[in-house]
């Protein structure tokens, strides 16, 4: 029983392969026709019921001695110049029909002679029969066609797959580098950029993906809140650093912003464009958003007391900036008259001196990175350095008249600059300042 099943399976397999060969898929039969040059395709019809051995016997028997010893089919098959003859037989209405495949490694002329010899067969077994050669297939041409078509497929696959793989490889390397730069900060192990531990200013974002996106574009002082509950680490940092809250442009981002403004000491607020998330922003969009940051006091009042959205506040602010030059021209003379009527006090003098530094204050305020400008008496820039290198820059440069930076003014910094004869120290805000030399004017952005 098992043997019969195995034979049936083999016959079915051979039948399928034979059908493919018959349809022109020569490569399906390459195991049988490995060294074949040509395949003779023939059809036969017998007036009676015959089987495969009858057809094969008729081919060998009736061509024997017909073409001489050199083209005798038995001899050619022994030497491998004629392959195994494939015969497919089916019976209908008392007649037998079928196909014959004769593999040949002879040349074209000899193969054509063999094909013509097949048509001389007039009996198969006890029945009259007729064989007709349908075609002689050039296997090498079929192989060449197969090679061309397959090569096209392989090339298309390479073109489709190779480029994405290269891009994926580059992106994987970049991602690995960014993740290596990513640190865990505080007891809550918040995802943060490598500059957060020592930077005077930090950017608070929503999640790990936001920090990674900012890292990709060179901003390394971001830290994530990782959820709607603001961690104690963020609250503590907000009391010591200049903090910019940078949230998504959706409702979730607005909710986190409101909570940050309530529990932390936020200095500035920036938002992603409406409907976008920080993690998907391009470098240009990130820089634009950070440059458009709004003081937290202004946002707090409008957001909670007047119920306005952040984007309404920004649009109103931009409108006021456009109207400001005209209003200034109209109102300035009146203000000057009022000042002249009052007794001159030190405060207006300091305010007047601060006005001369407005250009530099705006420059450092709009910078996405912590930066310090060292100016001479003529207000020319002597050096522009990262705030972490400020103390070294003060020691290395003489003739520093004023320092403008977007960092925190500390007592240590005041002591160092006063020893170097600096007259103006302008920063974002002060922290724990207990003494100040008379010769040094300490001014914050709020002043």
UniProtKB/Swiss-Prot annotation:
It catalyses: ssDNA + n NTP = ssDNA/pppN(pN)n-1 hybrid + (n-1) diphosphate. Keywords: DNA replication, DNA-directed RNA polymerase, Exosome, Magnesium, Metal-binding, Nucleotidyltransferase, Primosome, Transcription, Transferase. Its EC number is 2.7.7.101. CDD domains: TOPRIM_primases. Its cofactor is Mg(2+). GO terms for molecular function: DNA-directed RNA polymerase activity; metal ion binding; poly(A) binding. Residues 200-274 form the Toprim domain. It comes from the Archaea. Mg(2+) 2 binds at residues 248, 250. InterPro entries: DnaG_primase, Primase_DnaG_arc, TOPRIM_DnaG/twinkle, TOPRIM_dom. Mg(2+) 1 binds at residues 206, 248. RNA polymerase that catalyzes the synthesis of short RNA molecules used as primers for DNA polymerase during DNA replication. Also part of the exosome, which is a complex involved in RNA degradation. Acts as a poly(A)-binding protein that enhances the interaction between heteromeric, adenine-rich transcripts and the exosome. This is DNA primase DnaG.
């Amino acid at each position: 029983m098992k043997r019969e099943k195995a034979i049936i399976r083999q016959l079915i397999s051979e039948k399928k392969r034979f059908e493919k060969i018959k349809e022109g898929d020569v490569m399906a039969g390459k195991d049988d026709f490995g060294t074949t040059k040509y395949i003779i395709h023939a059809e036969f019809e017998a007036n009676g019921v015959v089987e495969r051995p009858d057809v094969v016997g008729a081919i060998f028997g009736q061509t024997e001695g017909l073409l001489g010893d050199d083209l005798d089919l038995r001899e050619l098959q022994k030497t491998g110049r004629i392959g195994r003859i494939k015969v497919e037989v089916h019976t209908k209405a008392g007649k037998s029909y079928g196909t014959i495949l004769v593999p040949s490694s002879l040349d074209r002329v000899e193969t054509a002679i063999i094909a013509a010899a097949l048509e001389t067969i007039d009996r198969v077994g006890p029945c009259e029969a007729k064989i007709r050669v349908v075609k002689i297939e050039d296997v090498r041409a079929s192989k060449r066609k197969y090679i061309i078509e397959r090569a096209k497929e392989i090339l298309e696959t390479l073109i489709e797959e190779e480029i994405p793989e290269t891009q994926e490889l580059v992106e994987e390397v970049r991602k690995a580098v960014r993740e290596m730069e990513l640190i865990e900060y505080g007891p809550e192990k918040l995802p943060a950029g490598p500059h957060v531990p020592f930077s005077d200013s930090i950017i608070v974002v929503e999640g790990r993906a936001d920090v990674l996106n900012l890292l990709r574009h060179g901003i390394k002082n971001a830290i994530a809140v990782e959820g709607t509950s603001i961690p104690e680490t963020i609250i503590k940092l907000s009391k010591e650093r200049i903090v910019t809250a940078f949230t998504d442009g959706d409702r979730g981002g607005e909710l986190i912003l409101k909570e940050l403004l309530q529990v932390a000491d936020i200095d500035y607020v920036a938002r992603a464009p409406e409907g976008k998330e920080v993690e998907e922003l391009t470098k240009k969009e990130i820089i634009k958003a950070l440059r458009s940051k709004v003081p937290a006091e202004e946002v707090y009042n409008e957001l909670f007391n007047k119920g306005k959205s952040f984007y309404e506040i920004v649009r109103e602010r931009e409108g006021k900036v456009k109207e400001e030059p005209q209003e200034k021209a109209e109102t300035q003379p009146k203000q000057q008259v009022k000042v002249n009527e009052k007794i001159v006090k030190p405060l207006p003098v300091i305010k007047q001196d601060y006005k001369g530094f407005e250009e530099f204050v705006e420059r450092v305020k709009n910078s996405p990175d912590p930066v310090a400008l060292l100016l001479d008496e003529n207000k020319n820039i002597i050096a522009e350095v990262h705030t972490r290198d400020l103390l070294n820059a003060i020691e290395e440069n003489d003739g520093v008249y004023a320092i403008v930076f977007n960092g925190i003014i500390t007592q240590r910094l005041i002591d160092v600059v006063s020893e170097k004869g600096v007259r103006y120290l302008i920063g974002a805000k002060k922290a724990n300042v207990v003494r100040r030399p008379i010769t040094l004017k300490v001014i914050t952005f709020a002043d």
